[in-house]
From Swiss-Prot:
This is Probable butyrate kinase. Belongs to the acetokinase family. The lineage of its organism: Bacteria, Bacillati, Bacillota, Bacilli, Bacillales. GO terms for biological process: acetate metabolic process. The gene is buk. The keyword Cytoplasm applies. It is an enzyme of class 2 (transferase). Keywords: ATP-binding, Cytoplasm, Kinase, Nucleotide-binding, Transferase. Its main location: cytoplasm. One of its GO terms (cellular component) is cytoplasm. It holds the Pfam family Acetate_kinase. It comes from Listeria monocytogenes serovar 1/2a (strain ATCC BAA-679 / EGD-e). CDD domains: ASKHA_NBD_BK. Its EC number is 2.7.2.7. The keyword Phosphoprotein does not apply. GO terms for molecular function: acetate kinase activity; ATP binding; butyrate kinase activity.
Length: 355
């Protein structure tokens, strides 16, 4: 049996919407938001009415009768740490998102928009595998200093979707497989997935793991400490050096990997060095996650937008294919992943979780 489900993915400069009937897309649309449109809003919460109007306009433009919907699902935002799965949107969840209790991001609006429409239609609303999915084994939380605990913040939605898809192609259940999955995008997260749980993963947001097109990843602590007290940068500027202006931007002045590849193919030495170093760091993290799984790795999966780059993935494959087979699952279809999670719950294949 298939169900009509609206999926909502609010991003920092776009709102992505799609209606599915089972796994069939009835329509999909991405609405881009200019900086001028968003300039009047002081924070993400102030954008709610603006995004709501976008949602209603898109539904009306496609002539879809919202009364046919059987569920609405939004991108999960910054919440308290939770296990992976599909969650019913509750008032407690909405309160935490409205208060930005665990951080501010455009994805915080996903559950809020989903619940508003679902409540009007008296149907359920959900989120699926938010970025705060935390399934880390206890030993992985220990950082090396008692005042700091390692946190799980990663591209959980795409990790889980890629893991389930590859497991299905292999004729297995994701919950019975051991994978090392690397999401390669503006941020990079590499996780050890043991029997359906991400038991260790780098914090892809706060300065941990490989550097990426715009994030610094792990840095030598003493040098960064010196920078903090040098008086050269404010706290906000230092944070931007970690997230937003780190990684490739700091080395080459761009976060466009198309531009970086063009420089590499033109033989620019600095570009080749940075490009190779990023692939090296990703490969090293994959190796570390293979140790977490004690070498029992069914496959290494490379996913995300950068997985489309044959030049980049080939460098990772060269350094890791001695561990196990490397499978490329490029891109990240977050709307499809949101829909799949809800379809499984509505069909009774999974039970929804409560926040």
């Amino acid at each position: 049996m298939s169900f009509d489900v609206l999926t909502i993915n609010p991003g920092s400069t776009s709102t992505k919407l799609a209606v599915y009937q089972g796994d069939k897309v009835l329509f999909e649309e991405t609405v881009r938001h200019t900086m001028q449109e968003l300039a009047d809003f002081n924070n993400v919460q102030e954008q709610f009415d603006f995004r709501w109007q976008v949602l209603r306009r898109v539904m009306d433009a496609h002539g879809y009768d919202v009364k046919k919907l059987q569920a609405v699902v939004g991108r999960g935002g910054l919440l308290r740490p939770v296990a992976g799965g599909t969650y019913m949107v509750t008032e407690k969840m909405i309160d935490d998102l409205k208060e930005n209790k665990y951080g501010e991001h455009a994805s915080n609006l996903g559950a809020m928009l989903a619940k508003k429409l679902a409540d009007e239609l008296t149907i359920p609303s959900f989120i699926v595998d938010p970025v705060v999915v935390d399934e880390m084994q206890e030993i992985a939380r220990i950082s090396g200093n008692a005042f700091v605990t390692r946190k799980s913040i990663f591209h959980a939605l795409n990790h889980k979707a890629a893991g389930r898809k590859i497991a299905k192609e292999l004729g297995k259940d994701y919950e019975k497989m051991n994978f090392v999955i690397a999401h390669l995008g503006g941020g990079i997260s590499v996780a050890a997935h043991r029997q359906g749980k991400a038991v260790d993963v780098n914090n892809a947001l706060d300065g941990d793991g490989p550097f990426s097109p715009e994030r610094s990843g792990s840095l030598p602590m003493n040098d960064f400490l010196e920078a903090c007290f040098s008086g050269k940068w404010t706290k906000r500027e230092l944070h931007e050096l970690i997230v937003g202006r780190g990684g490739m931007i700091s080395y080459l002045g761009t976060n466009s990997m198309l531009e970086v590849e063009a420089k590499v193919q033109a033989g620019e030495e600095k570009a080749i060095e940075a490009f190779d170093a990023m692939a090296y760091q990703v490969s090293k993290e994959i190796g570390a996650c293979s140790v977490v799984l004690q070498g029992k790795v069914d496959a290494i999966i490379l996913t995300g937008g950068l997985a489309r780059s044959e030049l980049f993935t080939s460098k990772i494959i060269e350094q890791t294919n001695w561990i196990t087979s490397v499978i490329i699952e490029p891109g990240e279809d977050e709307l499809e992943a949101l829909n799949s999670g809800v379809q499984r719950v509505l069909a009774g294949l999974e039970k929804e979780k409560e926040y």
